[in-house]
Amino acid sequence: MRRWKAAALVSLICSSLLSVWMCQEGLLLGHRLGPALAPLRRPPRTLDARIARLAQYRALLQGAPDAVELRELSPWAARIPGPRRRAGPRRRRARPGARPCGLRELEVRVSELGLGYTSDETVLFRYCAGACEAAIRIYDLGLRRLRQRRRVRRERARAHPCCRPTAYEDEVSFLDVHSRYHTLQELSARECACV
């Protein structure tokens, strides 16, 4: 009977030590395991734009009951880059080397803002700018296709996300040329996102 008690005690101690050791290893490996447990994010695109577009359409059409055959999309992947039609202003701004959507800042005079105030004071104006290509969703691809087929009119909906402020600075105060103080609400952006 004494042997069983000793064996049970040794087993209990060994399992406790093993449990503590596993927890410590898990905490030490947490740096390496952290990204695997983090929410999924889309990796930055490194493929050729034509191949990426083909992959997007393939993902869009996968499983759709009235899906177009994927071989209809193959001419897009085989297209030789050449002279294209003139790009629109949004496409020119979001050229391939453009920075991603983010907060930018510029020091400007209040009168340059065009809000009707005459002042020589300068303010730090924060604004949102950048490309939102990584934020394109299946919705955007589907809407773009419907617009191409003229099922949705152009002015009704946008088929791509825009870099916009999601939060604003509380207020900005300044003195005009007549020595009066003015306070403007939500003049500068505080946070930006692709919406």
Curated annotation (Swiss-Prot):
<protein>
    <recommendedName>
        <fullName>Neurturin</fullName>
    </recommendedName>
</protein>
<feature type="disulfide bond">
    <location>
        <begin position="128"/>
        <end position="192"/>
    </location>
</feature>
<dbReference type="GO" id="GO:0030971">
    <property type="term" value="F:receptor tyrosine kinase binding"/>
</dbReference>
<dbReference type="GO" id="GO:0031175">
    <property type="term" value="P:neuron projection development"/>
</dbReference>
<keyword id="KW-0732">Signal</keyword>
<comment type="function">
    <text>Growth factor that supports the survival of sympathetic neurons in culture. May regulate the development and maintenance of the CNS. Involved in the development of the neural crest. Might control the size of non-neuronal cell population such as haemopoietic cells. Acts by binding to its coreceptor, GFRA2, leading to autophosphorylation and activation of the RET receptor. Heparan sulfate-binding is required for signaling.</text>
</comment>
<dbReference type="GO" id="GO:0035860">
    <property type="term" value="P:glial cell-derived neurotrophic factor receptor signaling pathway"/>
</dbReference>
<feature type="disulfide bond">
    <location>
        <begin position="101"/>
        <end position="163"/>
    </location>
</feature>
<dbReference type="Pfam" id="PF00019">
    <property type="entry name" value="TGF_beta"/>
</dbReference>
<feature type="binding site">
    <location>
        <position position="147"/>
    </location>
    <ligand>
        <name>heparan sulfate group</name>
    </ligand>
</feature>
<feature type="binding site">
    <location>
        <position position="158"/>
    </location>
    <ligand>
        <name>heparan sulfate group</name>
    </ligand>
</feature>
<keyword id="KW-1015">Disulfide bond</keyword>
<dbReference type="GO" id="GO:0097696">
    <property type="term" value="P:cell surface receptor signaling pathway via STAT"/>
</dbReference>
<dbReference type="GO" id="GO:0030116">
    <property type="term" value="F:glial cell-derived neurotrophic factor receptor binding"/>
</dbReference>
<keyword id="KW-0339">Growth factor</keyword>
<dbReference type="GO" id="GO:0005615">
    <property type="term" value="C:extracellular space"/>
</dbReference>
<comment type="similarity">
    <text>Belongs to the TGF-beta family. GDNF subfamily.</text>
</comment>
<dbReference type="GO" id="GO:0021675">
    <property type="term" value="P:nerve development"/>
</dbReference>
<dbReference type="InterPro" id="IPR029034">
    <property type="entry name" value="Cystine-knot_cytokine"/>
</dbReference>
<dbReference type="GO" id="GO:1904399">
    <property type="term" value="F:heparan sulfate binding"/>
</dbReference>
<dbReference type="GO" id="GO:0001755">
    <property type="term" value="P:neural crest cell migration"/>
</dbReference>
<dbReference type="InterPro" id="IPR043401">
    <property type="entry name" value="GDNF_fam"/>
</dbReference>
<feature type="disulfide bond">
    <location>
        <begin position="132"/>
        <end position="194"/>
    </location>
</feature>
<feature type="binding site">
    <location>
        <position position="156"/>
    </location>
    <ligand>
        <name>heparan sulfate group</name>
    </ligand>
</feature>
<comment type="subunit">
    <text>Homodimer; disulfide-linked. Interacts with GFRA2 coreceptor and RET: forms a 2:2:2 ternary complex composed of NRTN ligand, GFRA2 and RET receptor. Also forms a 4:4:4 tetrameric complex composed of 4 copies of NRTN ligand, GFRA2 and RET receptor, which prevents endocytosis of RET.</text>
</comment>
<dbReference type="InterPro" id="IPR001839">
    <property type="entry name" value="TGF-b_C"/>
</dbReference>
<dbReference type="GO" id="GO:0007169">
    <property type="term" value="P:cell surface receptor protein tyrosine kinase signaling pathway"/>
</dbReference>
<feature type="propeptide">
    <location>
        <begin position="20"/>
        <end position="95"/>
    </location>
</feature>
<keyword id="KW-0964">Secreted</keyword>
<feature type="signal peptide">
    <location>
        <begin position="1"/>
        <end position="19"/>
    </location>
</feature>
<dbReference type="GO" id="GO:0008083">
    <property type="term" value="F:growth factor activity"/>
</dbReference>
